[in-house]
Amino acid sequence: MKVSDIRSKFLQFFESKGHTVVRSSSLVPANDPTLLFTNSGMVQFKDVFLGTDKRPYTRATSAQRSVRAGGKHNDLENVGYTARHHTFFEMLGNFSFGDYFKRDAILYAWELLTKTYQLPAEKLWVTVYAEDDEAYDIWAKEVGVPAERIVRIGDNKGARYASDNFWQMADTGPCGPCSEIFYDHGPDVWGGPPGSPEEDGDRYIEVWNLVFMQFNRDEQGNMTPLPKPCVDTGMGLERIAAVLQHVHSNYEIDLFQALIKAAARETHIDNLNQNSLKVIADHIRACSFLIVDGVIPGNEGRGYVLRRIIRRAIRHGYKLGQKTPFFHKMVADLVEQMGQAYPELAEAQSRVTEVLKAEEERFFETIENGMSILDAALADLKLKGGKTLDGELAFKLHDTFGFPLDLTQDVCREQEIGVDEAAFDAAMNRQREQARAAGKFKMAAGLEYTGDKTVFHGYEKLELPQARVTALYVDGAAVNAMQPGQTGVVVLDNTPFYAESGGQAGDQGVLKAGNAVFAVTDTTKIQADVFGHQGTLEGGALKVGDAVSAQVDAQRRARTVRNHSATHLMHKALREVLGSHVQQKGSLVDADKTRFDFSHNAALTDEQIRRVEEIVNAEILRNDDTHAEIMPFDDAVKSGAMALFGEKYADDVRVLSIGTSKELCGGTHVHRTGDIGLFKIVVEGGVAAGIRRVEAITGDNALHYLQGLDARLNEAAAVLKAQPSELVPRIGQVQDQVRALEKELERLKSKLAASQGDELAAQAVDIKGLKVLAAQLDGADVKTLRETMDKLKDKLKSAAIVLGAVSDGKVSLIAGVTADATGKVKAGELVNFVAQQVGGKGGGRPDMAQAGGTEPAKLPQALAGVGEWVAGKI
C-alpha cells in the first residue's frame, strides 16, 4: 500500500464515521507566537480544546504537515541516523470536541488498523494509564485484546501524572490519560514490550496515540473533570507506512525511496544506503514546505531554522563529493510524490526551487573554506588526543562562514568529537553585547508604569481639548514634574496621538497646559495600551495630574495615513501581479514614504512595477470609502481579511477594508482612497535571499518627485538641444557620435605611436651589443605604451626597453626585452627596478612586463638609471 493510499484511506475512513476532513494548516502556527512550527495535528484545534473557539463540527480528521526542528521539539541531530526521526512528517489524526470519547475512539482505531489496513490483531499491543480502568476494560472486554498484550503505565517520570501515558497541554489546562498502540515486528528484532527494561529496542514500535482529555488541571494540581471530554489522536504517516509496507525503517517506504534515489542522482552516488542521502531526502520535504508556507531563509527565528536545515543538507551533499548546487533540483521529485495531496506545493514549485537555489549558491561560496578549517582543526585535535572542539572556533565558523552550530556539531559527532558549547555561547553573547552597546534604544523602552491605560481617540480626531497627565519620565526615571528644557516622556489618560505600531511611525505634535508647551517628537508604547509621548518641554512647567490639550501635527499625519493606506493597496496589487506567495515580511510607514518588504525570489521587472502602480492608482481614482470594523479574529479570517504569519492577535481584531484590500490593521488610514492622491514606486531591491523591498511615495511627495523628474528631463533635453519627446533618439545619435570619435582617437594614437617609435629608436644606446632605451611619453595611456613597445622591439631587433608615462598623478610603466636577450635581462626585473624608485612595484613575463607607481616626480631619474642597470646584467 503506497503512502498516498494510506493517507487517503485514513481520511476516508473517518469521513465515513461522520468526521469533517480538515485540510492541513500552515507549518507556521496561526495566532500562536509561543510555537515555532506546527508539530502535531492538534495545533490547529488548540483553541477548540481550550474552549475559546467554536467550529461548525464536533468531529474532525486531518493529515497535518508537521516540523520538529529547533526550539523545544527538535529532532534535527538524529535525522538520517535513526530509522524514525524526521524534521518533516505527516500526522494523521481524528478529533472529538465533546462528541464521542474513549469507547468510540478505541473501537475506531482498532477497526481501521485491523479491517481497513488489515494488520494482524495478534501483532498489536496497547498501553493505558495505570489508573485508567475504563480504557483497560474497553480494550480487554470489548475489543478483546488479551491481558498479556495490555500494559498499564504509571507515573514513570518522577512526579504525579508525569507519565508516558498521561498527556498535558501545559502545566495547567486540559489533560488526561492516553492509550498507545504498538506494532510487534517479531522476535527477529531486538527489544521488549512497552514498560519493560528493553522497551527502547526496535521490536515494538508505537504507531498511534489516543489522548483522552477529561480533566482540567489548576495551578495547585487539582484535577476537575471537563464538562465535555475530548479526543485527540495522532498516528505518524511514515511510521504506519513502514509497518504496512513490511519494512523496518521509515526511509525504506516508497515515498522516501523515491527521494533518496533523486538525492543519489543529483550527488552522483550509487550506494543508496548512505546516511547522507537519507538526510537530504528528509530535508527537502521540510525546506520545501516551509517555503511554501512563507518562511524565508534568514538569521533569526523560523528563517534561521530553515537556513540551518538547508545548510545541513548541503553539507551532506558536500560530504558525498558534490561541490555545486544540487538540492534545489529535487523539488520537482518532491512535487511528483506529494503534489497531489498538497496542491499548494505544486503551485509554489518554481518559487521554492529558486529560493533554495539562491540559498545554495550563497553557502557554496563559503562551505569549502569553512570545511577546510574545520577538518584541519579536527585532525590537529585528534593528533593531540583531544575530544572537544574549541567553542571559539565553532563561533568563527558560524560568524565568518555561515556554519550553524548544529552543523559543526554534526561534523564533529561523525568523528566522535564534542563541541565546547559554553565557549561558543560566550562568544555569541559577547557579539550580542557589542551590538547592543552600539545600538540606540528608544527612550520609552523599559519605563515602569502601573497607572491606567491610555484611551486612543486618534481614529476620529487629531485634537483633544483636555487630557490628564498620568506619568512623567526624565532620563528613564519617573518624576512628579518636568522643567523647561528637559527632554522626557509624557503619559496621558486620553490621546489623539498614534503610538508607533504595526510599522506605522508614531505621531508628532504638541501638548499644552497654561504656559507649558511640550513638543512631541515621537509617540511609542510603554506597554501594550500605554502611550509614551516623547519630546521636550519648551516652556513652562508640567506636573503629574495636569490637564493638557493634545494636538497632532495634522499635515504629518495626513502624509502618514496616505502612505499607510497605499501600503495596503500595494500589498494587494503585488499579490495580484506576482502571485499569492507574496507575504509581508516587514514595513515602515512614515510621513515621507512607505517601505514594504515581502517574500519574492526575483527582482521586479519594469513592467511589473508599472502594473502595480496602475492597479494602485486605479483604486485611488475610484475613490472608494475606507471601512474599519471590530470583529472576532476567526470571523475576520473567514471574511477574507489577510492576517500576517506569526503575529499574535487579540480575540477581537480591527479589520480595515480599503478598495479591494482587506487586512487586519490597527493603524490610521484615509477616509477614501482618493485621499491618497497619487502613488509612485521609487525604489525596488533585495534585502535578503527571497526578500524584496519596495519604497513608494504618495500625495504631494509623489507630485514633487514627478515634477523633479520632469525638470531633469527638460534640462537634459536642453543640453542635447532636443525636445523631451525626442530625447531617446537624440541620445542614440550622441552615442553614435561618441563611438565614432573614440574610434578616430584610437586611430590617431596608433599613428602617433608609430611616429614616436621612429623617433625613439634613434635615441637607443648600444651597450655591449644590446640596444637600450628608457623614455617618457607624455600623455600616453597604457595601450599606447604597449603599441609603441611592440613597434620599437620590431625596429631595434635586439633590445631592452622601458617606457613610462604620467596620467592623473600616477605612473604607468612597461618594459620589453627581445627574445634573444631574455637569457640575460628579464623584463619583469627591469620594470620592477624602475617601479621601486617611483613608489610602486610590478612584474610579468621575461619579454614583457608592466608596473605602476605613485611618485611621478621621480620618473626621469629612475629612467636615467636603466642603462647602468642593464650594463650590470650583461
UniProtKB/Swiss-Prot annotation:
Q: How is the cofactor bound?
A: Binds 1 zinc ion per subunit.
Q: Which InterPro entries match?
A: aa-tRNA-synth_II/BPL/LPL (IPR045864), Ala-tRNA-lgiase_IIc (IPR002318), Ala-tRNA-ligase_IIc_anticod-bd (IPR018162), Ala-tRNA-synth_IIc_core (IPR018165), Ala-tRNA-synth_IIc_N (IPR018164), Ala-tRNA_ligase (IPR050058), Ala_tRNA_ligase_euk/bac (IPR023033), DHHA1_dom (IPR003156)
At the top level, the lineage of the source is Bacteria
Q: What is a single cellular component term in the Gene Ontology annotation?
A: cytosol
Task: Identify the EC number(s).
Answer: 6.1.1.7
| GO annotation, biological process | alanyl-tRNA aminoacylation; negative regulation of DNA-templated transcription
Q: Where in the cell is it found?
A: Cytoplasm
Residues that bind Zn(2+) = 564, 568, 665, 669
The chemistry this enzyme catalyses reads: tRNA(Ala) + L-alanine + ATP = L-alanyl-tRNA(Ala) + AMP + diphosphate
Q: Which UniProt keywords apply?
A: Aminoacyl-tRNA synthetase, ATP-binding, Cytoplasm, Ligase, Metal-binding, Nucleotide-binding, Protein biosynthesis, RNA-binding, tRNA-binding, Zinc
Annotated coiled-coil segments of the chain: none
Do you know which Pfam families this protein is assigned to?
A: DHHA1, tRNA-synt_2c, tRNA_SAD
Question: Required co-factor?
Answer: Zn(2+)
Gene Ontology MF term list: alanine-tRNA ligase activity; aminoacyl-tRNA deacylase activity; ATP binding; tRNA binding; zinc ion binding
Question: What is the documented function of this protein?
Answer: Catalyzes the attachment of alanine to tRNA(Ala) in a two-step reaction: alanine is first activated by ATP to form Ala-AMP and then transferred to the acceptor end of tRNA(Ala). Also edits incorrectly charged Ser-tRNA(Ala) and Gly-tRNA(Ala) via its editing domain.
What remark about domains does the record contain? Consists of three domains; the N-terminal catalytic domain, the editing domain and the C-terminal C-Ala domain. The editing domain removes incorrectly charged amino acids, while the C-Ala domain, along with tRNA(Ala), serves as a bridge to cooperatively bring together the editing and aminoacylation centers thus stimulating deacylation of misacylated tRNAs.
Q: Which family does it belong to?
A: Belongs to the class-II aminoacyl-tRNA synthetase family.
Protein name, entry field: Alanine--tRNA ligase
